[in-house]
Design a protein with these regions (language model features):
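Cytosolic, long alpha-helical scaffolding segments
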Residues: 14-241
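N-terminal amphipathic/basic-hydrophobic helices that include classical n-h-c signal peptides
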Residues: 1-17
């Protein structure tokens, strides 16, 4: 009986240790996703600063920082694969892993868009061409980054209402992008020698629009994590009523 009791205690201790290990693994995934989000936000901010200040060094720092964002995405993918292979996750944990993978891919794309902006900024600066104004690009960047920050906040605080509020704001970013397109086309007409420069500005504007799209995607993913519901479907039903 004594030996049986010891064996039972050892089994219980083993189970508790395993649960603690799995909990730490999940927290590592969550932590790395937040680190990736912070780096993606910083990258987008720096990309705008490089453009506004015509600063090659800042642009270079954005480009160099993209490798770290990519590395964290790879690490999250590996952690999720390892967790699933070690145990069959319960529904809630499985949703977290699913969202972590999808959100990390969106954040990786945010880093790519910021890098694209930095490279286009360098291209404009290296041509020694001057550009007159940035249109509504700074406003777009501010709105896109606020959406991204709030999407991450909804994940940290587990607040589906925050995720819900983000949807629809991407339409404001889309509208700003259309304004930019019209303005930059007019600037091309006014000064045909600057066609290449303002073509780059059109692409930069489009990159910030895409960053907002990725923020919207993350908010939808977080909403699904917290409610098991499709945010698109919820909003569609709300629109009908």
């Amino acid at each position: 009986v004594f030996l049986f009791a010891i064996s039972a205690i050892e089994v219980i201790i083993g189970i508790l240790e395993m649960k603690r290990y799995f909990h730490e693994e999940l927290e590592a995934v969550r932590s790395h996703l937040m680190e990736m989000g912070e780096r993606a936000v910083e990258s987008a901010n720096l990309a705008l600063r490089a453009l506004e200040q015509r600063d090659l060094d800042i642009a270079d720092s954005v480009i160099e920082g993209d490798d770290m964002i990519d590395a964290i995405e790879t690490r999250i993918d590996e952690e999720v694969a390892r967790y699933i292979s070690l145990r069959a996750p319960v529904a809630k944990d499985l949703r977290l892993l699913f969202v972590a993978v999808k959100a990390s891919h969106d954040l990786e794309r945010v880093g790519d868009e910021a890098t694209s902006i930095a490279k286009r900024t360098k291209k404009m600066l290296s041509s020694n061409e001057t550009y007159r104004g940035l249109g509504r690009v700074p406003d777009m960047c501010e709105l896109a980054i606020s959406m991204l920050k709030e999407a991450l906040l909804s994940f940290i605080q587990e607040e589906e209402d925050i995720a819900h509020q983000i949807i629809g704001r991407d339409k404001a970013v889309d509208a700003l992008n259309r304004e930019n397109f019209k303005e930059f086309v007019e600037l091309m007409k006014d000064d045909p020698s600057k066609v290449d420069v303002y073509a780059e500005m059109i692409f930069i504007s489009k990159s910030f629009e895409r960053i907002a799209d990725h923020a919207k995607n993350i908010s939808e993913e977080v909403y699904f994590l917290l409610t098991s519901q499709s945010l698109k479907q919820v909003i569609k039903e709300e629109t009908k009523s």
